[in-house]
Amino acid sequence: MIEADRLISADAIPEEEFLDRAMRPKLLNEYVGQPQVREQMEIFIQAARKRGDALDHLLIFGPPGLGKTTLANIVANEMGVNMRTTSGPVLEKAGDLAALLTNLEPHDVLFIDEIHRLSPVVEEVLYPAMEDYQLDIMIGEGPAARSIKLDLPPFTLIGATTRAGSLTSPLRDRFGIVQRLEFYNVADLQYIVGRSAQCLGLDLTPEGSLEVARRARGTPRIANRLLRRVRDFSEVKSEGAITGVVATQALDMLAVDTEGFDYMDRKLLLAIIDKFMGGPVGLDNLAAAIGEERETIEDVLEPFLIQQGFIQRTPRGRMATQHAYRHFGLTREDLG
């Protein structure tokens, strides 16, 4: 199973990029959720503008789909500068990074997505660029090779990652601002869904937006994807506004339940409950029971279920919690 194939995957899908970009907030006063991040960034940006400085380098981390790229764009807009965008895997050679850095204007933003995937060679070039706004370049080869230093304009590097722990300490320490994005609450997601509906020209009732929001796994990207699928359903199966009833029918048809679980989530939980009496069960046995690789369970299925309190990891294996039993209308006693 590929994570991107799931409707409730938080990973970006290229075909959605254009629509997602159109629905993104452009400024901090349009940014919903993450109140602590918003408050801090407002102060940091105002202070940098007041001094006439580039904003300190910024690291944004957190689960996928929470708006790291959106926040980077907002920072550039608020600072009134351009933003160049790239990603860690794309920067294969030091020259790739040098080409980007030497084309920056003063105070511009360089945004590197998946910054934890930078190669060591590229990362070494980044250190003096971040710290001293200087670029060390090797000219020539062999004994005739020499290093020259190029001065760079003051700029802001914004790095985004889902795996902050994978960053090397020297790189992490060079970020003056570090922000973690958290999962969104239902109220904030409902507002985001309502705003996206306006962008799409949809007649969405508060009950309809609530139904989409509560099944979106705390993630704006998933909320917007579900909204588009509900729109498809309403255009074919109903007329008029997207009400709570219409949204419920659409999401039930798509097999996304009230917790935001899909078929694979439920299959995993029911395997633990039905086949292994609620656990504990070892990962290899569980993988065999549902016909998936153990890596798929560990990296794709488990994290959200654990975070929501439906599965517990123990030294003896995985166990279903009371939340899992209640979700299916069961109790431990039902299993004998």
Swiss-Prot record:
Region (Large ATPase domain (RuvB-L)) residue spans: 4-184
NCBIfam families recorded: PRK00080.1, ruvB
UniProt xrefs under Gene3D superfamilies: 1.10.8.60, P-loop containing nucleotide triphosphate hydrolases (3.40.50.300), Winged helix-like DNA-binding domain superfamily/Winged helix DNA-binding domain (1.10.10.10)
Q: Where does ATP bind?
A: 24, 65, 68-70, 131-133, 174, 184, 221
Report what the protein is called.
Holliday junction branch migration complex subunit RuvB
Root EC class? hydrolase
| Binding positions for DNA per the UniProt entry | 294, 313, 318
Reproduce the free-text note on domains from the UniProt record: Has 3 domains, the large (RuvB-L) and small ATPase (RuvB-S) domains and the C-terminal head (RuvB-H) domain. The head domain binds DNA, while the ATPase domains jointly bind ATP, ADP or are empty depending on the state of the subunit in the translocation cycle. During a single DNA translocation step the structure of each domain remains the same, but their relative positions change.
Record carries keyword Acetylation: no
Sequence intervals crossing the membrane: none
Hydrolase listed as a keyword: yes
Q: Where is this region: Small ATPAse domain (RuvB-S)?
A: 185-255
List the molecular function annotations (GO) for this entry. Answer: ATP binding; ATP hydrolysis activity; four-way junction DNA binding; four-way junction helicase activity
**Subunit annotation:** Homohexamer. Forms an RuvA(8)-RuvB(12)-Holliday junction (HJ) complex. HJ DNA is sandwiched between 2 RuvA tetramers; dsDNA enters through RuvA and exits via RuvB. An RuvB hexamer assembles on each DNA strand where it exits the tetramer. Each RuvB hexamer is contacted by two RuvA subunits (via domain III) on 2 adjacent RuvB subunits; this complex drives branch migration. In the full resolvosome a probable DNA-RuvA(4)-RuvB(12)-RuvC(2) complex forms which resolves the HJ.
Tell me which family the UniProt entry assigns to this protein: Belongs to the RuvB family.
- Species of provenance: Pectobacterium carotovorum subsp. carotovorum (strain PC1)
Catalytic activity entry = ATP + H2O = ADP + phosphate + H(+)
Q: Which GO terms describe its biological process?
A: DNA recombination; DNA repair
- Xref: CDD domains: AAA (cd00009)
- The segments labelled Head domain (RuvB-H) in the record are 258-336
Which annotated residues bind Mg(2+)?
69
PANTHER family listed in its UniProt record: HOLLIDAY JUNCTION BRANCH MIGRATION COMPLEX SUBUNIT RUVB, PTHR42848
